[in-house]
A protein has these predicted regions:
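Short glycine/proline-centered loop/turn elements that form peptide/ligand docking sites
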Residues: 30-31, 48-53, 210, 229-234
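Conserved active-site tyrosine of GNAT-family acetyltransferases
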Residues: 32-37, 119-123, 212-217, 314, ...
Length: 350
């Protein structure tokens, strides 16, 4: 039996809950708050840092004003809007799909994917800067390689998913068909878009070293439960969403809330989904446009049970540019770092 010393915790430092926030650099907080309200978000606490404090925590020599956006009673999948006095750059921009190293995107469940598509199509007709991937049906049996349902004979179990890319926002929406997963997203039926909190967030790498992702489960303590190759033939939705070339393969790795189970009843939202291409793939590198200080989706946060203990693990686990533990713009203790895959993160004391 392990011995313990009174007053000293033996709990391993670990992330807790689901992915906490998707951070979005914006030029105007009020305008972006109004945008996200249509997806069921509401403004919570505001906070600020001067340029010296922002440099120490985020590595950005610019004053910062932020607001956290909540969604119903969700404790994960939230949004943090970050208004930099001097942004680094304009961010990832508007591309026809999500394919690039540095890519980040947020995913929400919706009660009607066609409702979202109608708004996006109308915005495009009006000349707004927007890229749209229309709803694509992903039948679960086809994706997993199992026998799919016969049309007009058996229920089709799957999702329709679509992508909306704007200068500041990289959003994916999906609607379920033929199944329920009660802990995986809660839709606000009263908002314009009838959407949930972020059920998961994504990032993309082009790296032949599969071990680079061990950092997320072995250091941060997330639950890896899906890790598989997706050849072109099985990538029904991914072909368009990730811009696959004919015959090209890719890999998907899911890192979940440590409490999440595998059954539909036990699965929890708050997932980190990582898409990996081979290093030789033709994938643009925009990682320098996807870090704190950039406009658009530029940072993810997670909460941890022991911030100082996790700081030591991250230092020893291959991360770089690890800040000291500081106070963030909301008064929480936090530190930032760059993971071995090149992506920026901030961890907060739970």
């Amino acid at each position: 039996m392990a011995q313990t010393t009174p007053g000293i915790s033996t709990v391993r430092p670990s992330c807790v809950g689901g992915l906490y926030e998707l951070c979005v650099g914006v030029p105007d907080l009020a305008e972006s708050i109004a945008y996200y309200e249509r997806f069921g978000c509401r403004a919570g606490r505001f906070g600020s840092l001067d340029s010296a404090a922002a440099l120490a925590l985020y590595g950005v020599d610019s004053a910062l004003r932020s607001v956290r956006l909540h969604h119903l009673d969700a404790d994960h999948g939230l949004v943090r809007l970050m208004q930099w006095e001097r942004p680094r750059n304009d961010g990832l921009g508007v591309d026809p799909n999500l394919r690039c190293v540095g890519s980040r995107w947020g995913v929400r469940l919706t009660a009607s994917v066609l409702n979202v598509a109608n708004h996006a199509a109308r915005a495009k007709e009006l000349g707004q800067p927007i890229a749209l991937i229309d709803p694509i049906l992903a039948v679960i049996g086809e994706v997993t390689g199992e026998a799919a349902a016969r049309p007009f004979a058996e229920p089709i179990v799957g999702v329709r998913e679509m992508v909306v890319i704007q200068p500041l926002y990289r959003q994916v929406f999906f609607e379920r068909f033929g199944y329920q997963s009660p802990l995986y997203g809660r839709v606000d039926p009263g908002c314009v878009m009838q959407t949930s909190q972020h059920t998961h967030a994504g990032l993309m790498i082009a790296n032949d070293d599969h071990q680079v992702l061990r950092f997320y489960d072995e250091v941060l303590g997330l639950k890896r439960w899906f890790d598989a190759e997706r050849p072109y033939e099985q990538a029904t939705g991914s072909r368009t969403i990730f811009g696959l070339e004919p015959g090209e393969t890719h890999w998907m790795v899911d890192f979940d809330d440590p409490r999440s189970g595998h059954s539909l009843e036990e699965r929890r939202s708050g997932k980190l989904k990582i898409v990996r291409f081979a290093k030789s793939s033709r994938v643009a590198d925009k990682l320098d446009r996807s870090r704190p200080g950039c406009l658009g989706y530029s940072l993810y946060t997670w909460r941890v049970n022991d911030l100082e203990g996790m700081w030591k693990r991250v230092q020893a686990g291959g991360a770089t540019t690890v800040s000291d533990v500081r106070t963030d713009e909301f008064g929480a203790r936090a530190f930032s770092f760059v993971a071995p895959d090149g992506y920026s993160w901030t961890l907060l004391q739970a």
